[in-house]
């Protein structure tokens, strides 16, 4: 009896800590991306969002620090104010809290490299606080990333509420992005912006590249959850959010999210080929997502084709009739999979004897809704062949045939200094910087968020592309290579891959774990052509931390204590 009471007290003592982290995660997935600075005006309704974009990066940076700081202080206060009995019970789990996984060690190594890089930097203040006109990615922000990671990985517990509210908040952000894409400004955030910024800012996220990054880290969550939702209203929520997210991606003016989404869908299509029910739901969601692009045609017609600048891919997906081909294919696959799964389920419910019509004699068998492994292997080989063909074409037209006119595809298939809105220039010069660095700087970099100083010798050359300076390489991995060196980049790659791999290994039966893994994959892919910043990267850190949290809870040694593994 006493043992039972102790266990109940222990669980009660843990519940406030988990409740704090639940609120923290919800705030980071709803309040944080929705937040825009509000100013007071002299006329009704006395509140204005017109200045929201002028300091959006600093505002969200400050909000993240504040939310994380409040969560840390709350956890400390909960521990300090525990009564002696609860504190004694909580010590039982102290060893588990202090246990380090391979992901934990990589995260600590990443922070340690950032600290060493800051100490060795010639620009210590910038390395610590971050470049004010850059991305605020200094040691201070990295420290708060570490704190957020530790909070989530130690105290997070899965809740169905979290992906639901995330979907609701993201749907609002997506809808605003779609409206802003056609110069419809319901929040009046573009009133005081110059034309250039009106074209490149959107929704409550800011720059279109940041919007693409946000879609990359959120949309995969809803696509995966739409395959898991048991109730129709919940599934409708995730499918609606997915469709709005796809439309927002087409209106964002940036291709990085399309790249990440394509890789994610390819991987999960192959993975779900082993489960016909999941594959059917995935194809249904994909069909509706693709069909939703037709709504943009109606919006375009209603606004007289008055929209922001679109990329070649986005223009084709919205205005070209070829989009009907994948829509029809996905719809046909959905219908075929529906018929197959229904037929298999009916076969599983068969009479005990051929001559019996009594329902009481029905034998309930688990329907076989899996394809042979050979089918999955064949799909994987086909995907690899497609990827190899694309990469082969990229290498061929970049290194061998550099003269053939590729038209609009040249921006995609021919790498040179002009490639990817002159990202090629940033990358080529960045590798020259790394090559010419001494051993210490190769290992630890120039200091966090000091890319501006490292790249300054090339500013004169950069003017031919219309820029006078830059604070980022427009490739997260190259950026880390220059700022925190090879050691920092290696630690970062180990951390994000470790979180995803461990979640897949130990918690893959949980659909929310699968959703967070999808977010990590999609973000990691789009990061090849995008940048880390305090607007969307904190959300990625939270979702990657959830991967590790669920892996910790579902490891074999803890399988008797978890309540949600495999659900």
Can you say where each PLM-predicted feature lies in the sequence?
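Hydrophobic alpha-helical membrane-insertion signals
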Residues: 39-83
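Juxtamembrane membrane-water interface segments that cap and precede transmembrane helices
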Residues: 43-58, 126-128, 191-204, 304-317, ...
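Alpha-helical transmembrane segments of multi-pass inner-membrane proteins
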Residues: 2-38, 63-78, 107-119, 139-155, ...
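Interfacial loop-to-helix junctions that mark the boundaries of transmembrane helices
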Residues: 51-63, 97-100, 133-134, 315-323
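Non-cytosolic membrane-interface motifs at loop->transmembrane helix junctions
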Residues: 129-137
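Helix-to-loop transition at the C-terminal end of transmembrane segments
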Residues: 42-46, 123-125, 179-189, 302-304, ...
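Transmembrane alpha-helix boundary signature
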Residues: 75-97, 117-128
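TM-adjacent membrane-interface loops and short helices in multi-pass inner/ER membrane proteins
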Residues: 207, 417, 421-469, 484-488
């Amino acid at each position: 009896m006493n043992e039972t009471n102790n266990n109940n007290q222990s669980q009660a003592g843990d519940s406030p800590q988990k409740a704090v982290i639940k609120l923290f995660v919800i705030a980071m997935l709803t309040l944080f991306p929705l937040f825009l600075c509000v100013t007071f005006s002299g006329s009704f309704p006395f509140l204005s969002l017109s200045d929201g974009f002028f300091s959006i990066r600093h505002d969200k940076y400050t909000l993240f620090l504040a939310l994380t700081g409040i969560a840390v202080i709350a956890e400390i206060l909960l521990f300090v104010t525990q009564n002696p009995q609860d504190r004694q019970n909580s010590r039982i789990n102290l060893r588990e809290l202090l246990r380090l996984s391979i992901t934990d060690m990589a995260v600590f190594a990443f922070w340690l490299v950032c600290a060493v890089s800051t100490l060795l930097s010639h620009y210590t203040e910038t390395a610590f606080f971050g470049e004010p006109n850059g991305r605020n990615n200094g040691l201070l922000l990295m420290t708060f990333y570490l704190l957020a990671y530790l909070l989530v990985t130690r105290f997070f517990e899965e809740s169905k509420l979290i992906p639901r509210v995330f979907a609701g908040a993201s749907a609002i952000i997506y809808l605003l992005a779609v409206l802003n894409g056609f110069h419809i400004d319901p929040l009046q955030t573009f009133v005081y912006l110059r034309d250039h910024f009106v074209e490149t800012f959107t929704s409550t996220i800011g720059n279109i590249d940041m919007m693409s990054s946000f879609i990359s880290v959120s949309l995969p969550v809803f696509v995966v959850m739409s395959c898991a939702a048991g109730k129709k209203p919940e599934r409708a929520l995730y499918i609606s959010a997915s469709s709005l997210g796809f439309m927002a991606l087409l209106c964002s003016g940036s291709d990085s999210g399309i790249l990440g989404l394509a890789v994610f869908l390819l991987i999960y299509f192959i993975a779900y080929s082993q489960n016909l029910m999941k594959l059917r739901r995935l194809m249904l969601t994909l069909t509706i997502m693709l069909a939703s692009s037709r709504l943009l045609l109606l919006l375009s017609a209603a606004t007289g084709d008055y929209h922001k600048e679109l990329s070649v891919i986005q223009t084709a997906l919205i205005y070209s009739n070829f989009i009907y081909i994948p829509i029809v294919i996905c719809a046909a696959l959905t219908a075929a999979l529906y018929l197959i799964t229904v037929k298999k389920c009916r076969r599983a419910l068969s009479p005990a004897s051929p001559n019996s019509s009594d329902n009481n004699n029905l034998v309930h068998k688990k329907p076989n809704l899996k394809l042979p492994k050979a089918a999955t292997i064949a799909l994987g080989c086909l995907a690899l062949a497609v990827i190899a063909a694309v990469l082969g074409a990229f290498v061929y037209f970049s290194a061998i045939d550099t003269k053939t006119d590729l038209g609009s595809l040249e921006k995609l298939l021919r790498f040179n200094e002009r490639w990817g809105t002159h990202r090629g220039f940033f990358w080529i010069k960045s590798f020259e910087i790394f090559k010419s660095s001494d051993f210490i700087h190769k290992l630890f970099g120039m200091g966090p968020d000091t890319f501006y100083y490292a790249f300054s010798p090339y500013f004169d050359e950069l003017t031919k592309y219309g820029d006078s300076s830059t604070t980022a390489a427009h490739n997260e991995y190259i950026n880390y290579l220059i700022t925190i060196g090879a050691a920092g980049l290696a630690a970062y790659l180990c951390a994000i891959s470790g979180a995803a791999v461990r979640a897949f290994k130990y918690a893959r039966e949980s659909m929310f774990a699968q959703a967070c893994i999808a977010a990590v994959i999609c973000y990691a892919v789009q990061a090849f052509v995008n940048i880390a910043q305090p607007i969307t990267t904190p959300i990625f850190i939270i979702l990657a931390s959830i991967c590790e949290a669920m892996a910790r809870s579902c490891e074999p040694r803890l399988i008797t204590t978890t309540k949600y593994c495999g659900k």
